[in-house]
Amino acid sequence: MTSAFLNLTMAFTLSLLGTFMFRSHLMSTLLCLEGMMLSLFVMTSTSTLNSNSMISMTIPITILVFAACEAAVGLALLVKISNTYGTDYVQNLNLLQC
């Protein structure tokens, strides 16, 4: 295992732990999710460059699409909660009744 792959794995793990630890605010949870998606994107991009498979070339682009969708939905929820309640607490998600 190379040191770059180890660093990316640690970045993913720290973002995952941050998601579990900082659950009270939606903004910090969204930032941790973006860190996870960024580390996944870089890991798949580097592994795609090392392999010569044409099928695996689309995986990093697919991860970017999912990251963009996750960011859009997360920011829409953040705006809705902030406008309605004035705070970005995750406990307010239950009150939206979506």
UniProtKB/Swiss-Prot annotation:
Reaction(s) catalysed (UniProt annotation): a ubiquinone + NADH + 5 H(+)(in) = a ubiquinol + NAD(+) + 4 H(+)(out)
Record's subunit section: Core subunit of respiratory chain NADH dehydrogenase (Complex I) which is composed of 45 different subunits.
Name of this protein: NADH-ubiquinone oxidoreductase chain 4L
PANTHER family recorded: NADH-UBIQUINONE OXIDOREDUCTASE CHAIN 4L, NADH-UBIQUINONE OXIDOREDUCTASE SUBUNIT ND4L
Role this protein plays: Core subunit of the mitochondrial membrane respiratory chain NADH dehydrogenase (Complex I) which catalyzes electron transfer from NADH through the respiratory chain, using ubiquinone as an electron acceptor. Part of the enzyme membrane arm which is embedded in the lipid bilayer and involved in proton translocation.
Entry-linked Pfam families: Oxidored_q2
Organism annotation: Rattus norvegicus
Record-level GO cellular component terms: mitochondrial inner membrane; respiratory chain complex I
Compartment list: Mitochondrion inner membrane
Family classification: Belongs to the complex I subunit 4L family.
Gene3D superfamilies reported for this sequence: 1.10.287.3510
Its membrane topology: Multi-pass membrane protein
Domain of life per record: Eukaryota
Gene Ontology biological-process entries: ATP synthesis coupled electron transport
GO molecular function, one term: NADH dehydrogenase (ubiquinone) activity
Alphabetized UniProt keyword annotations: Electron transport, Membrane, Mitochondrion, Mitochondrion inner membrane, NAD, Respiratory chain, Translocase, Transmembrane, Transmembrane helix, Transport, Ubiquinone
Enzyme Commission identifier(s): 7.1.1.2
TM ranges: 2-22, 26-46, 59-79
